[in-house]
Design a protein with these regions (language model features):
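Terminal, low-structured helical/coil segments at or just beyond the last alpha-helical repeat
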Residues: 172-216
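Start-of-helix register in tetratricopeptide repeats
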Residues: 31, 94, 127-128, 165
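N-terminal leader/linker segments that initiate helical-solenoid repeat arrays
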Residues: 18-76, 80
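Short coil turns that delineate tetratricopeptide repeat
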Residues: 90, 123-124, 157, 161, ...
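Canonical tetratricopeptide repeat
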Residues: 98, 131, 169, 203-206
Length: 216
């Protein structure tokens, strides 16, 4: 079974959206390498006694240099496994997105953005573009990030139907683009889940803080 290691409400929906869009089955060996990469990262995080919630990556700020070096080794090992996954499924966007996500786990945001852009070249999905925007913003490329967010919102706006994951990603893209009032109207009209609605409305007050809660 494929797994995508993402935390936080919008990112969980990003993962769900990507899985829904899968239109071809990857090689079984790719699936196995991917699962090994995720298991390796999860095992490290569990040993590090960091809970897998929206505060997980923010805890990286207080880690010692030793812990950061260990984290780099873990990220590098995960990337090697995902390189093997891509060897057997080179046209499958999912593994490019996985590499981006696991680079982000180690706060390597330029690499994360680069690999998410590669995923976009394989399949043009708003979920992937949202991820690219977030990683670009964390890398300090705010203008490029906002261009991605506006494009994401336009893509969702033109869809005839939106899944629950689509609606949350749509609202989050508007939040990150700074369109506070439009984001609030979209949340009011599209988000029915009480918890998701509450979290997203809170995020409209400070988009950068919301992003920093997901990534250090």
């Amino acid at each position: 079974m494929k797994k995508l290691l993402l935390w936080g409400l919008p990112l969980l929906c990003l993962a769900a959206g990507c899985r829904e869009q899968t239109d071809e089955t990857p090689d079984e060996r790719s699936i196995a390498y991917n699962d090994r990469a995720i298991a390796l990262m999860q095992d490290y995080l569990e040993r590090d006694e960091v809970l897998p919630d929206s505060s997980l990556l923010a805890a990286c700020r207080t880690r010692t240099d030793t812990i950061q070096r260990v984290m780099k080794d873990i990220v590098d090992s995960c990337q090697t496994l995902l390189d093997s996954a891509l060897l057997y499924s080179p046209e499958h966007y999912f593994y490019y997105a996985q590499k981006a996500t696991l680079y982000a786990c180690g706060a390597y945001y330029q690499e994360a953005a680069r690999w998410m852009e590669k995923a976009l070249k394989k399949k043009d999905l708003p979920e992937l573009r949202l991820g690219a925007g977030m990683f670009l913003q964390k890398a300090g490329e705010e203008q490029q990030a906002h261009t991605r967010y506006r494009h994401v919102a336009d893509q969702y706006r033109t869809r005839d139907t939106l899944s629950s994951a689509d609606r949350i990603n749509y609202a989050f893209a508007l939040i990150l683009s700074g369109e506070k009032e439009m984001a609030r109207r979209t949340i009011d009209s599209l988000i029915t889940d009480t918890l998701a609605r509450k979290q997203l409305l809170q995020m409209t007050e400070n988009p950068q803080e919301a992003l920093n809660a997901l990534f250090p």
